[in-house]
Amino acid sequence: MAKQPRAEVTRQVIMDAAVELFDEVGYGETTLTAIIERAETTKGAFYYHFADKEAVAGAIIDEGGVRVEEVTRRITDSSSAGLEKLIRVTFAVADLSTHDRIVRSGYRLRQGLYQISPAGSRSYVERMDHYVKAAHDAVFEGDVCDDIDPGELFELLHTMDLGCHLLSDALSDDLFAHEARAWRMMLRGIVPPDKLPYFQEFVARVARQYAQPE
């Protein structure tokens, strides 16, 4: 039997309450009772949707992954050049993780709690497929050096992205500035010299679109 809209609303309220508490005190310090109280629901309503706190965290990881996948697919399926897609998608996902609390919480939970949901590894594989295709296009188009393996380029981008998020969280500063600096450094190693000025300017232009006000 399909869940009724009212039940879906309750489920979302519980997830939102958990996200707030995970942000405020951390996953480890958040109790099941605190989630139920913050959601202003009952134990019965909670257990209708979730078996325990880990199940809520898993649902947050899942939902965050879905939202990231939607943004990634929209950009990588566009008609833009391959390397432009890769640059745009890193900033778009950074923007999503900055302004969407589910995505931001999902990122943090996934880094420490891979074991509670298959969504972590699944979202990695899904992102890899999109990124590798765009990387193949970038090599074919001559914007990335032809001796660079698209799969290895994805691994580098994924590592760069995780590092930017970790630094931004640790320093409480601008994620987009970290992304821009990382791209400027990485482009020197993957882009032919004659293409470098264009893509350095492209990164700067995209970064300005997402720049946080002073």
Regions found by a protein language model. Name each.
Residues 47-50, 54:
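A short His-aromatic
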Residues 1-25, 29-41, 54-58:
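Basic, helix-initiating cap at the start of DNA-binding domains
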Residues 128-129, 133-137, 141, 170-214:
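C-terminal peripheral helix-coil segments that are non-catalytic and often amphipathic
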Residues 59, 70-103, 150, 154:
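Hydrophobic alpha-helical connector segments
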Residues 44:
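Key DNA-contact positions within bacterial/archaeal DNA-binding proteins
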Residues 13, 84-92, 152-159, 177, ...:
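Amphipathic alpha-helical interaction segments
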Residues 91-148, 166:
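Short secondary-structure transition hinges
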